[in-house]
Every structure is written in C-alpha cells, then in structure tokens.
C-alpha cells in the first residue's frame, strides 16, 4: 500500500498543475471546488487515474473534493499512486498517407454532413473575424505555410469509407490565402463586400480543405482576418492552439517542436483501449440499465418543418465582466457548486421553462486528451467526447436546487463516462427503433484558458464576429473565458424555432446569471416567472376584458320575448311548429305540473327520452319552476342511465316520448300527458342568476360519469357573448342538432330564444342524417349553426347549394380544421366562421377566434385557434410546475371567471382536483393542451389524455393528425396507438384525391414530423367515424385500424424476403452487422428503424465495398436508400453489367456460409478428409465436430440442392448437416426408383454410418416427413439414437392412405406442382426442365400412394410439426395428427406462408432445429 502522505503530494502536484497554482498553495483539507477546481478538470483527473487502473469515479471525488480525502481513497483502494506521464521511447511513427480511423466525434460530424441525415447537411465549423491593423499578407502566408507543416491535421482528407488520411506535405507550396484589397473602395461598398464575405464564409462547407484563411485590407491600414476551421479536423481547444501557433509564427517565433502526431494518437487509442476492460464493461452495463428510462431531448417550440430546411446559424452572446464573473463564481463555490454547473443550471432552467418537460436529455461535450505522450496537449485534432445528462428539474424551485440537480446529474453520468455519450445515443436509437438525436448542447470551456490568448489579439486584432455550427445540433450553448470575464454564447439553427422564443430564452438566462451574481438571496428564493413582462401585459389585457354581467337567468329572455312578440315563430319541429306564445304555454304547463308534483326550488329534474321539439318546453318549464334539469338521452345504456340518476340526486323525472326502460327511482311525469292536459296558469317567480341551471353528465377517465353543475350566470356569460359577437336577433333561425345531453344545446335553445330567433329542431330520427340537416337549413333558411367539427364536416359533404342562408357558424368542442372554414366559404359565402374553445365545465365555450379570410389561411395552421377569452373570462397556459408558460410553449389550459361551472355533483375530491385556487381566483383545469401566440391568441394543440409514448418519445396524437391534414389531398385524419400494449402507431385518413396512397402519405409526412411520429400503418377510409356528440370516435377508429391490421396479418412493418441473390447477400451483411438473424431483416425494413446508426451504416458500406466489389458506394447512399431493396436497386443501377453483381453476391454467400474447415478444404482440397462412411449422394455440410447432426429429407420431386440454404443456415448455427438425395434426380438420375417409402428409407439408412454422427435430428418436408418417420423407426430398431423428428408441411403417417392416390399422368403431375406453389410456373413451361423433373416426382408419388401406417405406430423421438398458416393442402388439424405417432414430446409451430413457407423462414427454422440438436 502506498503511504498516504506520498500519495497526497503527488495528487496535490497534479491538481496544482490543473489549476495553474503552486502546489504548496493547496491545503490538503481545503475544498478544491472553492479553490477553483471545476467539473471538467475533475473529470480529467478521473480519466487520467482510471487509465492507470486506479478505481475512482467522478461522483466519489466530487462528494469529498479535498486532497486529503482523495489520497486516502487512492492509496487505500488500489495501492497505486498516480504517476507522471512517462517520456516517450520509440515513437513508432506511422506512415504518412495511410488511412486511420476517425474519432467518434469526427465520425458523427462526418455522417452529419450528409443531406439525408436528420438535421444534417451542415458542416461542423467555427468562423471568426479579427479586426486589426497592418496585418501583412506575405508574413501571414509564410506563417500559415509553416503552421500547416507543423500540424498535419490541417491537410487531412476524409475518405468515403469513413477513415481519414494525411497526404504528404506539398513541398515548397505556400498555404493558400485569399486577399481582398478594399483600401480604396467607398465606405458603403466596403460594408457591402464585408457582409458578402461573412455571409459566404460563415456557413460554408469547406470543399477538400479544413482550414481557410482570408485577409481583407481596409482603408486606414485596417485589416480583417477571416479564419474558418472545419471542426471535424480540430476541436475548440485545437483552435486555440492553431491561432496561438499562427500568432507566434507570424511574429517570427518558433513554437516548441512536436515529437508526436494526432495520427499516432488515434492509432494508439484504436490499438489498445486505454481504460481497463472491467471499467468499460461496468459503465456500459450502468447505461444499459438506464436506456429504457432516459428522457427525450428538450422539446422546444419550433416552426413546423423548420429544422428540415434551415442550415444557417445565428449567435446570441453576453459577456460577464470580471467583477460579475467573480461574484457569481464565489457564491456558487460557497454552495459547493462549480462555475460550469452554475452556468449549465441556468441554461437547463430556461430549457425546462420553454420545454414540454422539466426532465430532458442534455448533450455535454467534453475535451478529453489522454496523456499518451508529453506533446498531446500541443496537438491539433479532435479530442472530444460527450456525456448525456439526464437532467430533472422537477420540483427544483430555486436556483440553488437546480444547480445541485444538474451537478448531481453530471456526477452520475461522469462516474460512468468510460461509455461515451455517442454510444449511449446509438443504444437509445436501437432501443427505440428510430434515430435519437441530442440536438441541444451545453459546452463549457471554463478552465481551458482565454478563448484567444493575448498574442493572438496583439497580432491580428480584436475578434469582432464569431459563429459556430454543427450537424444535428439545433442549439449549442457555450461558456468560455474571454477578456478576463466569461462569454456566454448561443449558436442557434436559424429559422427553426418559433418567433421570439430564442431571444426570450437567452434574455431569461442572462437575467438569472446577473441576479445570482448580485446577491445570495436570489439563490434560495423561488425563481421569478419566466414569462416576459411584454407577454404578461398582452395576456393581462385580454383577460381583463369585461362586459356588464347579466342579472337574469337563462329562461328570462324567452319569457320577455314571448310577451313582446307572442306570435313570432319560436320552434320548428317535426312534431309541430310553435310560436313564442304557444311555447310559453307549454313551458308554463310543465312548470305547473312539476310544482304540483312537489318540485321545490333547486330540485333536480331528469329529462329522459329521444330528442324532440317538446324538450324545449320541458327545459324552459323546469327552469321557470326553479328547478335544475339533468338530461339523459336514449343512447345511454340502461346501467349507465341508472347510475346517472343515482349520482345526480334527482328529485323528479320528466319522460319525453314513450315510457322508458330505465328504472327511475323518483316520481315521474310523462311530458305528453302534461302537454295534453288543460292549460295551466303559471307565473315564473323572480329568478336567481347564481342558482344552478343544469347538470350535464360527461364521461370520466375512471369510467364513472361525472355531473357538471352549471349556474345560470355562468351559462348566461356564454349566451350573451354569442349574441353580441354575432349580432343575433329575431331574424335568425338556429339549427338545433345537439341533444340535451350535449352542452351545445344550451346555446341552441337559450341564445336563439333570448335574441328572439327561432329554433329548427333536428329530431331523433334526423340527427344522424346530414342530408336531413341540409334540407332543414334550406327549407327554413337557417342562419346560425353551433356545431361540433365532425358535424360540420358531414354537413359540408352533402350540403351542395343548400347552405347559402347561413350567416353565423360557430364550431368548437374538438379540433377545428382550417379546411372547414375554406369549404364553408365556398358553400355559404356570407357566413361568418368562428372557432371556439372550452368544455362543459366552462359553460359550453370560453374562447373565440373568428376567421377573417378563410381562403388564405396560413398553410402551417394545424387548427383554427381557440382565440381569446370571452369577456368576464380569463385564461392561463400552465406548465407542470404550475408556472405560466411563455409564448409558444404548450401547457394545460386553465379557465377562470364568470363562465365556469360550480363543480361536479357529489364528487368533492374531483371538484377540488379540477377546480383550483390561484391568485385569489378559481380556475378550471381543462386538460386541453394549448399555447399562446405572440399576440395573445390561444392555440389548441391537443389533449393531455391523448399523449402517448411511441418508441420512448412522448407524442401528441393531435399533432400527428394536424400534420396529416396539412398534406395535399388529405381531407381528414385520426391517429391512434393500436390496442394490445404495443406502441404501434396507426392512422385513418380520408382523401379527396384518388392518386393519394397510404405509402405516399407516409413519405410526405416525413417532411413534417420526425420518424417516430410517422404511423406504421395508414388506412384509407371513406369517412372518419364521429360520436353522436360530433367528436372523433377514437374507440371506433382504433377498432377499425386494429381490424385492418389483423386482416392483413401484420402488426408491424410487413416482412419481405429477398427475391434476388444480391438482396440475400445484402441482407446477410446487414443482419450480421446489426446482430440480427437473417429472417429478422426484410428487404423493405428501414435499416435505422432496426437499430442501425451512423457507425453501423459505415460498417455496412465498408462490408459491401469489400465483399461485393462495389467501391462506388458511399455512406450517404446508405442514408438515402435505408432499405435492402433500395440499396440493391441503387447498386444495380450503377453497374454496367448487373449479372456481374449477382455472381459476386453468390460467391460471397457461398463463402459466408462456409465454416473454417470448409474454407480450408476449398483452399487445399488435398487436405480435405475423405468421407468413406457415406454414399457420395449424401451431401454433407460440416458445422462442428461435436456429436449430433441433422439429416434433411427433401419433398417429393425435390433434389438435395433445394435444401442447400437450409443446410447452410444450420451450419451457421454450428450444426453438422446432411441432405440425402433420392433416386431419379440430379447425380442419382440413373438410379432406379424405390418401390415404396419403406424401401427408400432403408436405402437411405444403409447409405452411411449414422451411429457415428448420432444422436440424429431428422427434418423432412412434405413427403420427406414420411420418409424421415420410417428412417426413425429403422434407426431406433438398430440402436441409432434419434433425438427428434421435424415434420414440415407433411401429412401424419396414419392419414396418408385415406388421402387417396396421387396423380400419375404428366399433365396432372404438373398441375399438382403448380397448386403446391413450390416451383416457378415459368420453369414448368420449359420442356427440358419438365423432362428432368417429372420422372422424379412420379416415382415419389408412386411410393407415397402405396404407403400405409396404423395410428398406433410410434417412435420414441420427439415430434415437432411445422407448417405455413396459409397452406391449403396441409391444415393445422393434419399437422396435429402427428402427435399420435410419438411417445415423446409433441409441439406444433406455424409460420406465415403457404406449403413452401420454408423459403422465407430458413434462419428461423434453422434456429429452432439446431436448438434441438444439443
């Protein structure tokens, strides 16, 4: 054991070196974080020590950051003290010009440059402009030439196979530098030219070069140096080295000589892993356990499709001056928080505030130079790795708590950093079956020194413009030391994010940093809202709109109108039209009857029965009598209706129509009897607007219906807003489609009658017939509709020219598609159209948005917005944390004000959960997901209960539906997850263009949503099913889609077997690299959905280039093709001679299926061991020298060659395999046919020393199963062990005789073969082929026709029956009959396919059979 004191001194020296201080300045017991040691440098120590076999991890070091604790940990744990890096001996210089591997981050950037990559088509590069004076072009050129000689990576070339090479230096050739002389150009032209240079260079992809210098000479001896570096060749630390060396060389000073190269460094890393294997394995296992639970990257508000088209970045920056930096870092260290984590936490905070979740995945690049040589820190190259942080700020209400959470996330991840973040991402992609990116990055360069050393700024000037970008990155936040302070930068992919989002986020982060630097209180106090003041003001103005509250109840307006215009029409219905006076009389009769039956003010009256015009009088009478109405329609199941009656605390019941079948436990009146009685005088008493008006029962998430209690004044706020907004009056006629159970009926009745208009009632017989609605509109010249979106969709389908009278159409209750407004404008040009938002709990509606120009709605609208709150209402969009969401951030919509319900009847707990207090007001939590636009408009984005998990991602089904509906030719869509516990996404789509197909929809959708949001199944329907309440019937959609998928026999992507030799070869290469069985990879399966990633794609391309002699194939081709079928087509299209490629593929497959012994035998046939124990027509495929073998028996007419691929698949599973050849075919064509199955079995049994290969597993297909059975009987009688018989697509022995004779005439034999489907019909038209085939088939048929076996004949071996589920000759019952012929175990398996299912499932069958051998 190393003495702790000695260990302490060594550790202190290393820490002092990292901190740039004297060792004696560090006290052994001092907290090193307080001394300036940050997380990045602590990780450097961990990496350095772990490479020397010292078992330490970041979390342990971070928990006790003192030299004293660390020395005890190291000395006690390992007995090994850290040592200095040894001086190099033989450098082992590699040859310049030889290819060498890309580093992991290099590879990621190389792949990301390709256009076919998600968020790709972008070079990782850093561009800087230095504004200085008198920079000399010739001196700069000379310095750059020497710089390129010093750092070979400035000459690097990236090769198509995913490697890199450094060509020899070009002798005396100068480094190219472009010089633009603008010294004598007008100032406005100078500015224009400089802007053009910046625009061209700041986002270019350097073509064949990785480092570019340009110099602009400006008036007054000013200069601007333009420096562009491809980050694939050099990381940020290397950039500093490059500029420092360039400045020194420009000044005539020679930097220290280098005795090591980046190429040697990479080769050393590749040749010998620098971390002990147990460490790597442990860290990989640690991440593997967490893969299923890892969160998504931050879901920030983006423009639809924006990230697919934008390739430029913009920068936001803020400089923290030295005083602010010192104050911020001192306060952080006092809390045990490193400066880097303080800045990371401020960034994480804004991500949480503007993201869909406070838990997310954050990408953290690390600068990691392994000390393999003393000169490593002077090299230029890519030394970066990455960490993925699982950041969870849930419940972290203070800055200190957030910083601790982020620091703990870093400690946890850094403690297992031997498995890098890029590998974790690839594993996560494989787990989810889709490419997962981490496009939000936080890069800390604290502790690495100033961004530009003083020598650089002295020689070249002040950096005036800096921009960086990287492939597959949307937001890269960086913190770096600059000019004595800290520079906080955001490089953001331009045009991707919603307007104003990035500016608001960046401002919030900077404000938080300044607040934390200013005082200690800011660390521990609850953080202020992220809502910018300007956004808060907009919302406050809209929430503050008021209108004079009504002092009347819902029915008061009707009775006033009845007095003012008694003869005006009030109701048009199939049961009879009513004037206001007639309707008043009916309502009074109802009120009087209820009072006579014992109704007291506030009692609840159930209204049961079908929808009729008389129901209008019923509800008016109930309200006039002081009651509360509770409707129950005829569609309610009896049990549910009775539960509603019990839960609803009903006092009386009023039945409309015939007596109902529901058991009503309260006094009941028949409406027909009430209206038929003598007119009754009833004068309504004074109304109370605060009293309850109605109780509507809606479905509950638990399955128990919940009764929403709504008071008169709440509903009146909606009614009066409606009347004011649409200027409704006595001339208006309303189509009353909604049943009383639907809250839309409140407006249909009370808004119409309060304004003096008339109601056109859609009765029970008409309410599911949109053509009847159109007739009513046309007949009665209806002017106003209050509809669900589904109803309007159905109406517009049949409306024709019958809707022109409409002038006010309000649609709400579900997604309001923009196309509804456009279609309505065509059929009713004078109609005003408004979308509304709300719920039964918000007294029908709470918000409104009127469409002003339906023909020119923005194409990216997913729906008509919810709009703005009604007067006297207020809205909030609330995050999970309870905070207000900033603009464009989705959260739960809360509604407050006059227009909300009182609660749920008899459900105080539910009422308390959904109606909450905040800021002195009661708010209803709608469960709707909404977001604010910059002008205060609310947009509905879905339902919280419609969020699902797909491939590990949280997905809003409404977003998928909205994207589908934006596609050309798509009329309507509904998305769902198929039932059964899967995460298979499916969609039902209605199209109005016959050219639109399910596949074209999926392809177009890829331009709008990420891969995991593209439905695996798209089914075209004539109409999307709706519920009676006008909402999408999601249960019915799910059932339809599930039935369609079940009908097609596939819940996943359809498996397609290879059709050509080339496709089989490509499948073999892809399957091997993915680590999958061959038959688990179909030719139409997406490589990346199967778990492929950029690294594996590179390996596939390398394999194809090498094994199939296709040097033109590039990795970009793999990303473009994605499937084996497309890849085969691409390769064939590039070949002048496609047959050559097929031949090469066949050779590859032959070799790939050979064992080492086969290869050696082929290379040296003299050494191939003879097989004297077997007849030459017993085909042997050597798989192992272990006991046990499989013996394959072909089908009738089948040759041994037909089972070559099965044999090779068995060999691939390390199984010795034999295939027998029957007489009358191939190399036994001259051998006489066997007279019987028994004789054939005996001949085969005597063909070899089978006891030497036992135990045997027999496999027979069709007739071969019968031959195998007789072979097994012979073997068991002669003491040769048989483990199992696999009977494939064959009759059981005892059933053969009853099947009758098989055909013997040539024509009938050929017809039978066509029916079985095992032979290409084209071949059967070839006379030569038929002459070879038919004699063999007829011989086998004759033997089989004479076969008979009693049902009690058994073998001891297990029998496994296997068949195809679509085999019309051998049914499941026939296969089951094999069970009677074994005294051992019996199993039955089915594969998708017909009689010759085996051709598509070779590998799966081989795995099953081979598992039986051992």
Curated annotation (Swiss-Prot):
Pathway: Siderophore biosynthesis; mycobactin biosynthesis
Keywords from the named record: Ligase, Multifunctional enzyme, Phosphopantetheine, Phosphoprotein, Repeat
Keyword NADP: no
Gene3D superfamilies from the UniProt entry: 3.30.300.30, ACP-like, alpha/beta hydrolase, Chloramphenicol acetyltransferase-like domain, N-terminal domain of ligase-like, Nonribosomal peptide synthetase, condensation domain
Residue numbers of O-(pantetheine 4'-phosphoryl)serine PTMs: 39, 1094
PROSITE patterns: AMP_BINDING, CARRIER, PHOSPHOPANTETHEINE
Residues that span the membrane, as ranges: none
One Gene Ontology molecular-function label: ligase activity
Stored Pfam families: AMP-binding, AMP-binding_C, Condensation, PP-binding, Thioesterase
Annotated EC: 6.3.2.-
GO biological process: amino acid activation for nonribosomal peptide biosynthetic process; secondary metabolite biosynthetic process
Cofactor section: pantetheine 4'-phosphate
Enzymatic class: ligase
Cofactor binding, note field: Binds 2 phosphopantetheines covalently.
Region feature (Condensation/cyclization): 96-394
Residue ranges, annotated region (Adenylation): 579-975
PTM remark: 4'-phosphopantetheine is transferred from CoA to a specific serine in each of the two carrier protein domains, leading to their activation from apo to holo forms.
Similarity field: Belongs to the ATP-dependent AMP-binding enzyme family. MbtB subfamily.
Function: Involved in the initial steps of the mycobactin biosynthetic pathway. Putatively couples activated salicylic acid with serine or threonine and cyclizes this precursor to the hydroxyphenyloxazoline ring system present in this class of siderophores.
PANTHER family in the cross-refs: NONRIBOSOMAL PEPTIDE SYNTHETASE, PYOCHELIN SYNTHASE PCHF
Name this protein carries in UniProt: Phenyloxazoline synthase MbtB
Organism, as annotated: Mycobacterium bovis (strain ATCC BAA-935 / AF2122/97)
